[in-house]
């Protein structure tokens, strides 16, 4: 327990004076907790306005270029190292939203946008998008690359190609950052995520599983649930984290499709080459 609620604060919040304060965390460690990501090798991810891959490391390690952030996870202790390694990409869902508002047919829904993108083959017939239009990216050593479209051919590409290339570009940025995490000794075999935001897109899920070779597990949970569970664990309402998350419901599993892997990896290499030229 970290303290008790003061009377002045309790009255503002409509809570009882003396309520125990047993848990606090940043948004991504809390999201990881909501997915029961607590032990070395376990991975949580989000795909909102920005995107995050958050892994737990059981040993002290860091990226010498500071492209990812390392800090104590919610269950770290002096005798049991549990460090969170956070990869953050600013230009994720915000790019997909931009395409929906400015490129796709007016009034289109996100499911319809996904269906439009699905009419285009993997690799978007040579079209690549670097999704870095939401500020400098830490994983690119804080360089301001901006968003850019590469390989555009007026005789081949249309709105559907841009819709698919945007999601593939987002996925490839995840892959680029996950390779940095791999260099730190974090082996990413399974990604856990809430069933929300870009993880609702079949194209995004399929591409992420395909290019990284990871299994994606989707759960019916969110950060608010994680915070409540964390407070319950701290207050002793649950005897253990295992008890707290016994009811966590897995609702979908996406396996890498071996028949598509080469196509995704080939498209990633084209994308990566274009990124490296932009960084030069």
Feature roles, as predicted:
Residues 7-192, 197-280:
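Active-site core segments that coordinate phosphate-bearing ligands/cofactors
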